[in-house]
Amino acid sequence: MHRRDTGQPIRDAIADAGLSIERLAEKTKDVDPLGYGISRSAIGHMVSTGPSGRDEFEDRSCDLVARALDKPIEELFNGNAPT
């Protein structure tokens, strides 16, 4: 899946939830049935607008971030080309 608008919806959702990247990473473990979650660095790639920013991510990672933020996945990511 691809992040929307270079990650702005993700950054907004993190801010609205009052979370840090570290706390969001912890929350992804809470919502992961396997208990693994995703790393702080992976979330950093999702939200970065600089050289470390990435546009494409595994579906599982996107799902965990959306669930941890209590947002529909479609608000944060899409399955098509980057927007």
Where do the protein language model's features map onto the residues?
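A short, Lys/Arg-rich alpha-helix, primarily the initiator
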Residues: M1-K27, V31, D63, E74
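Recognition helix of helix-turn-helix/homeodomain-like DNA-binding domains
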Residues: D30-D55
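DNA major-groove recognition helix of helix-turn-helix
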Residues: V47-P51, S61, F77-N80
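DNA major-groove recognition helix of helix-turn-helix/homeodomain DNA-binding modules
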Residues: F57-E75
